[in-house]
Amino acid sequence: MKALKKLFTLALAALIAAGTTLCVSAADIGPYSENGKIISVSHGGNWGEYPIYSKAAVESAFELGADCVSVSVKRTADGQFVLCKDNDLGKLYAPYKGQLISALSLEQVSQIRITDSFGALSDNRLCDLADAVDAAKRFDRTLIIDDGWEYRKELYSYIVDKDAVSNTVIRTDASKGDIKEFLALTGGALRIVGSYYGNIIFNARSYVTSLSKAGCAIVELGTKNPFGVIFNKSMLSAFGKNNYLTRAMISTYDPDLCGQRTDTESTWNDLIDRGYSVIETNDIKGLVNYIGRISSLRTELMTLTASAEKLDKNNCSAKSLQEISDAKAVAAQALTTLSSHEALAEAKHNITLALNDLSVSNENHVRKGVLKISAGKIIAVILVTAAIVAGQVYTYKMQRKKKAAKSPS
């Protein structure tokens, strides 16, 4: 009981002081992410509630806790940038079929009302890049710019002028040679996400290794194949070569980018345990909640591990010590690597069971050479002794009666 009370006290103290998070150097985690942190990317902003590529969608995603928002950009006739996937507005917003962003000025584009996810006209307008960058800076988050590689030099100048280099990333599926050239041109000041889509392991490994050496911040991998090479841990080990800190990214919002998987927690569990630390999703609420629960589990697991370290091993059986040692090893592995919610929950379950078994067994184990006597044990000994004496008296009387019956009168 004392051990159990001790465990509860330690757990309570740790939970009260649980304002800090586990810090593990990137070198200790090999091919995975620094501090075991999973990065959430909202594809197009929170367009479940607001029209995609609207200012409200971008800001809402950041408010929900997204680390990054990915947006596509197009350039207007007067050289300004707005958020949109296609130059033809009609491909995204039916009422404007045939209207090209490249043929309109920024002022004209800003007057266009865009449709919501149900196709109804809203009061929202297309967000220009300036507003999106300002939102990223205000929330101290990151904007990932897609489809802007052809404007990369102009975008770089624009981002520098906005003092937003630390809040902006450009994503491209350009060749590794073009990406390396641009990184060299900018001195690596602007972060780049290089994207490889395919299923040839030699090409994928070469792409990852080359861009890692060049200082690419993130490399995204994608394939339609459910059993593609990008899901192979030996492939993902390329991210850990020579201690480069490049992160592995995957997009789950489109099944064609993640081997026909769904944009759900079960998929995130699987991909994180394979080595992906940056996930792009359409369900930003769900992913942010999932990452939050991972953080809580890490804190709980650290608390339980600390409790296991401080238990008095003199009161433990050899079997209990082995069980707790095995559980601690699993917990340490989960805490010092990139781990999914599922992996952390399993580690917590194992160490909780070991501690519970240990707290019960402590009541039944006595240290060698120490006699432990309690009032209950004394009473039990007295009762057993009394029963033995009563039995002997009864037997003696019965024998006397039998002898008396056999004696001649």
Indicate where each model-derived feature is located.
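Basic side chains
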Residues: 2-6, 43, 74, 298-301, ...
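Alpha-helical protein-protein interaction elements
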Residues: 35, 98, 308, 386-388
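Gram-positive cell-envelope targeting signals
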Residues: 1-28, 364-409
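Phosphate-group recognition and catalysis centered on beta-loop-alpha active-site segments
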Residues: 9, 17-296
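Beta-rich interaction/scaffold domains
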Residues: 296-371, 377-378, 391-403
